[in-house]
Regions:
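Contiguous, well-folded functional domains in the mature portion of proteins
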Residues: 1-264
Length: 264
């Protein structure tokens, strides 16, 4: 019994510290201290209980090693999951194409090329130079943590008039050239009245952006169009005919959160 209490205490402390560290490094919600943290503690605790008679004094060591392993497996489940959410479909609204938190909301004036920013570093999205975006417009940056769904959905219904992929290089998003040189994919959707752009940017050691759609295809609002495997960022280009409905640091959810609504 004393051994089990020791294991439980060590596992709880290690798991809690792990999620606090992840919160500091990746800005995940503190709610995971009560969700995934508890699940990790219960799973590792149960394994330790079942194995205590087989490994005896090694129970503590095994439990310590299992915490990050179980935590990683749980994160992968969250990462690749298809969320069971009823999609929000509103022809007068722009729905978030990604899970994550809002890191900036900037206005783009006529004649300017959209700029994407990550950790204070700004890069020009040159692919928009030849696209007739309805200026002025907004650009909203969404940072996706390892705990967010990394599948992306269309913010509006319409026709994909641009779908450009850039292979990029293996650079950390902390690198000043990351946004310009890391792999990214850009689509622009035209609903006959407005055009909305979505830019998917990969993180270091990733280069794994998967796109399910092609230029010329018609898409429904909240339809899955791609995925960024592992760390990433999504930028949304929105016409100023829309009123922004989110704020900085807000957590948003793909197919669920309304980013902007058409002005009356």
């Amino acid at each position: 019994m004393n051994l089990l209490l020791l294991v439980a205490g060590i596992v709880a402390l290690e798991s809690s510290l792990m999620y606090v560290y992840l919160h500091k490094k990746t800005h995940i919600s503190l709610s995971y201290l009560y969700k995934d943290n508890l699940i990790v503690i219960l799973i590792v605790g149960a394994i330790g209980y079942l194995l205590q008679n087989l490994i005896d004094e090694w129970t503590v060591v095994v439990a310590i090693c299992l915490v990050p392993v179980v935590g990683l497996l749980l994160t992968m489940v969250r990462f690749f999951r298809f969320p069971l959410r009823k999609p929000v479909r509103n022809e007068d609204a722009i729905v978030s194409p990604a899970d994550g938190n809002i890191i900036y909301i900037k206005k783009i004036e006529k004649g300017d090329v959209p700029m994407s920013t990550k950790e204070g570093v700004t890069a020009t999205l040159h692919e928009f130079a030849n696209v007739e975006l309805p200026y002025p417009c907004w650009i909203i940056g969404i940072n996706m943590t390892p705990f967010d769904v990394h599948r992306n959905a269309t913010p509006i219904a319409g026709k994909i008039i641009m779908n450009k992929h850039f292979d990029g290089k293996f650079l950390s998003l902390k690198n000043p050239n990351a946004i310009a040189q890391n792999e990214r994919n850009t689509i622009v959707i035209d609903n006959g009245v407005h055009q909305v752009g979505v830019v998917q940017t990969a993180s270091k050691l990733v280069k794994r952006i998967v796109t399910y759609k092609q230029a010329g295809e018609q898409v429904e609002q909240c339809e899955w169009f791609g995925m960024i495997k592992f760390g990433s960022q999504v930028d949304v280009i929105i016409p100023c005919d829309y009123e922004i409905a989110v704020e900085l640091k807000q957590q948003v959810y793909t197919r669920k959160t309304i980013l902007a609504t058409l002005k009356k």
